[in-house]
A protein has these predicted regions:
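Intracellular coupling helices
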Residues: 1, 265-283
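Alpha-helical transmembrane segments of integral membrane proteins
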Residues: 1-54, 249-269
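Membrane-interface helix-boundary signature
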Residues: 4-11, 242-252
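Transmembrane alpha-helix boundary/anchor motif
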Residues: 24-31, 233, 262-266
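Membrane-proximal extracellular/periplasmic loop immediately following the first transmembrane helix
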Residues: 31-96, 101-102, 107
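"Rare, low-scoring activations can occur
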Residues: 60, 64-77, 144-148, 152, ...
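Hydrophobic secondary-structure segments that place a key small or acidic residue at a functional site
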Residues: 104-184
Length: 283
């Protein structure tokens, strides 16, 4: 009947609208994920391998570990930190006050060569030195966001976490996902007596990654054979950090494909029905 035909046409149109909305949503999610993966993080994440050591090995053998790794010509340098940066949405946080302003900041306690190994530029003041690691007074390097937001100055005393001085400022880095905004970040170097179990291994450009990974594995088995170590690169770390977004993209894509298939089946069914209806009218 004419009313039935109108209803069928309306339903097909609704299916097409739903399909188009889902396709647009899938495209938007894909663009968003691509943007997050290609966003400039402020540090050189390529050619960096990360290996977590147990505290005993770090305390006893970290110098041997570095020297043994650097025997491979594909390894440029090795740095250490307490945190695996870039892997989560929050880090050790401290509250402080500067020139009467209260603020929160992430604390990254690291070795003196950490910024250089990670490719983080110092924009004002100086970088950490080996002497800073031996000092009982902490050397602080804050990021640009903290420097500009709090009007920080090189040479100022700072004792929010431990007594020390501001020796410089780095460019902004993004160690959390893009779900949040810019964070105040402080890099700290000093004679804390803490273990820094996360090792950052900078590979030279053009090095044989498989050979380097094999050398790292051999070194770990030699120095700490019972420890179940894992070698990570930032591609893997970001896959974990943005897993929710990846799952959403996959889910929207699947529903979009299902909606398209259902719409095509509906159109095919409508064509078949109309053909049969016309035949009956002619007959």
């Amino acid at each position: 009947s004419p009313s039935g035909r109108k209803l069928r046409t309306t339903l097909i149109c609704v299916q097409f609208v739903v399909s188009i909305v889902l396709i647009i949503g899938a495209c938007f999610v894909q663009i968003q994920n691509s943007y997050m993966r290609n966003f400039s993080l402020g540090f050189d994440k390529d050619q960096v391998a990360i290996v977590e050591l147990n505290e005993t090995m770090y305390n006893k053998h970290h110098d041997t570990y570095v020297n043994r790794l650097k025997e491979n010509p594909g390894i440029e340098d090795v740095a250490f930190a307490m945190e695996k940066v870039g892997s989560k949405d929050g880090y050790n946080t401290n509250g402080g006050s500067y020139k009467g302003k209260d603020f929160q900041y992430f604390i990254i306690i690291a070795s003196s060569n950490f910024l250089r190994v990670m490719g983080i530029p110092v924009i004002e003041g100086r970088d950490f030195s080996k002497a800073d690691e031996l000092s009982d007074h902490v050397s602080y390097i804050f990021n640009r966001t903290a420097m500009e937001g709090l009007d920080m100055q090189v040479g100022d005393a700072f004792d929010s976490y431990s007594s020390g001085h501001l020796i410089g400022f780095s460019d902004d880095v993004k160690f959390t996902s893009l779900r949040g905004g810019e964070d105040n970040i402080a890099f700290l170097v000093g004679n804390f007596g803490y273990s820094l179990p996360i090792s950052y291994i900078r590979l030279k450009a053009g090095s044989d990654i498989h050979a380097v990974v094999g050398h790292i594995q051999e070194t770990m088995r030699e120095l700490d054979p019972s420890y179940p170590f894992n070698i990570e690169f930032y591609d893997e770390i970001f896959n974990h950090l943005y897993r929710k977004e990846e799952n959403l993209r996959d889910l929207v894509t699947v529903f979009s494909l299902l909606a398209i298939i259902i719409s095509l089946v509906g159109v095919f069914g409508l064509v078949v029905f109309e053909t049969q209806y016309r035949r009956k009218e002619i007959g």
